[in-house]
Curated annotation (Swiss-Prot):
Its EC number is 3.1.26.4. It is found in: Cytoplasm. Belongs to the RNase HII family. GO terms for biological process: DNA replication, removal of RNA primer; mismatch repair. InterPro entries: RNase_HII, RNase_HII/HIII, RNase_HII/HIII_dom, RNaseH-like_sf, RNaseH_sf. GO terms for cellular component: cytoplasm; ribonuclease H2 complex. This is Ribonuclease HII. A divalent metal cation binds at residues 20-21, 117. One of its GO terms (molecular function) is manganese ion binding. The gene is rnhB. Residues 14-206 form the RNase H type-2 domain. PANTHER family: RIBONUCLEASE H2 SUBUNIT A, RIBONUCLEASE HII. It comes from Chlorobium chlorochromatii (strain CaD3). Manganese or magnesium. Binds 1 divalent metal ion per monomer in the absence of substrate. May bind a second metal ion after substrate binding. The lineage of its organism: Bacteria, Pseudomonadati, Chlorobiota, Chlorobiia, Chlorobiales. Its cofactor is Mn(2+); Mg(2+).
Amino acid sequence: MHTHYEEPLWQHYEFICGIDEVGRGPLAGPVVAAAVVFPRWFQPTEALLTLLNDSKKLSAKERESLVPAIKAQALHWALAEVQHNVIDEVNILQATMLAMNNAVKALPIIPSLLLVDGNRFTTDLAIPYKTIVKGDSHVFSIAAASVLAKVHRDALMCVYATHYPHYGFERHAGYPTSAHIEAIRQHGRCPIHRQSFKLRQLGEKV
């Protein structure tokens, strides 16, 4: 992947920020967002960065190898987490918006333009933005944000797995696999589970 999408925009915007999130679907843990700004007119000359794509299309090893390259080449990057209890309070959509906005606010600069993966974004920031469906497959800065968010969240869930070993978080990162649902059936929910995410498989009213 290259910066073909950003190139015409750089004529008008100096600091273009790609934003993506991971963790909307899991039954446990936080939603994590990343914001990445590459230098104006950046071209990925490092061979590793040309492999950059939607994090879901990369292996865990590929994602992890990309993280130091992204951080080294980016002008700025930031991560933000919104925890399970906040997700239960405000709903997953609002929690996702909060995470993405907080990632932008954590940057040391004010971006000129936000490029957001997906088709929906709300913000109180006075920054123009574009939503891009499948942006993590087409836009370099969004793909970079996707990788940073995914690797960060997977690492968090591996830490949680040591505290709550019955659930296999290190294998499924909290997503509703059959093994995860069976673990909830046997052991109940643990403190990092999203209480508002109900399961038909357990006879819960959705």
